[in-house]
């Protein structure tokens, strides 16, 4: 039988307050009932459309040659108008290059996490397992699938064509991972998510943390004195 899963004791969360999450999915907070209905409607569409996301579906081959490598370009870097091949890219301070979102994995990453959250909240509110099941599929396809799973590094994040294959500043692309952590904890309430898959996701993030703490790009970003350093923390 389908029933709301908010009666289950929520696990400790990283960003959100579990009691507040419970109040939201129960509809206890005035003015949020329509928002919750919209989230459930979005979850229905996500399940129906069956769209999954992966770094491997990007037409742009990263410098590593491995489609599973996350790739993005710096937001303020543009093709060089003075060279035939556009290289090296030149910086236009404060001018966002829309080409970035056409060649980068960043939009797919954000879309995946947005969908996972919608499905997770809808699952918490209704107990409808297909929501949790498709959220798990999104997570598996992005992180764990043998052919499509992202490698646990950001070697090629915010690359600058013709100058560098990746920078520490690109780590901020994955700041949204913080949002994903709470969704993963909430999905642990689903009986459809196997322990082996849960462990595999944790192993992936252990490897990612190891890269962050030891790779020169990670070390550089950790030492940053601006919003990038804060995002790293």
Residue spans for each PLM region:
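Extracellular glycan-targeting catalytic surfaces
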Residues: 1-219
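Long, repeat-rich segments with strong aromatic
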Residues: 231-233
């Amino acid at each position: 039988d389908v029933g709301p899963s908010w009666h289950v004791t929520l696990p400790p969360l990283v960003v959100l307050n579990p009691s507040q999450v419970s109040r939201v999915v129960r509809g206890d907070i005035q003015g949020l009932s329509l928002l919750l209905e919209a989230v459930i409607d979005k979850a229905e569409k996500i399940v129906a459309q069956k769209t999954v996301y992966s770094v491997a579906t990007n037409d742009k081959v990263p410098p590593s040659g491995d489609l599973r490598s996350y790739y993005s370009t710096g937001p303020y870097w543009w093709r060089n108008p003075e060279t035939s091949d556009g290289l090296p890219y030149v910086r236009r301070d404060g001018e966002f290059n829309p080409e970035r979102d056409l060649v980068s994995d960043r939009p797919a990453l954000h879309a995946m996490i947005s969908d996972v959250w919608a499905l997770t909240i809808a699952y918490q509110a209704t107990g409808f397992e297909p929501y949790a099941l498709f959220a798990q599929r999104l997570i598996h396809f992005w992180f764990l699938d043998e052919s499509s799973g992202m490698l646990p590094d950001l070697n090629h994040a915010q690359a600058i064509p013709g100058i560098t294959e990746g920078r520490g500043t690109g780590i901020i692309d994955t700041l949204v991972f913080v949002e994903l952590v709470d969704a993963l904890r909430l999905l642990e309430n689903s009986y459809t998510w196997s322990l082996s898959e849960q462990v595999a996701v944790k192993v992936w993030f252990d490897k990612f943390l190891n890269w962050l703490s030891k790779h020169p790009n990670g070390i550089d970003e950790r030492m940053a004195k601006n919003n990038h350093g804060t995002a790293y923390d």
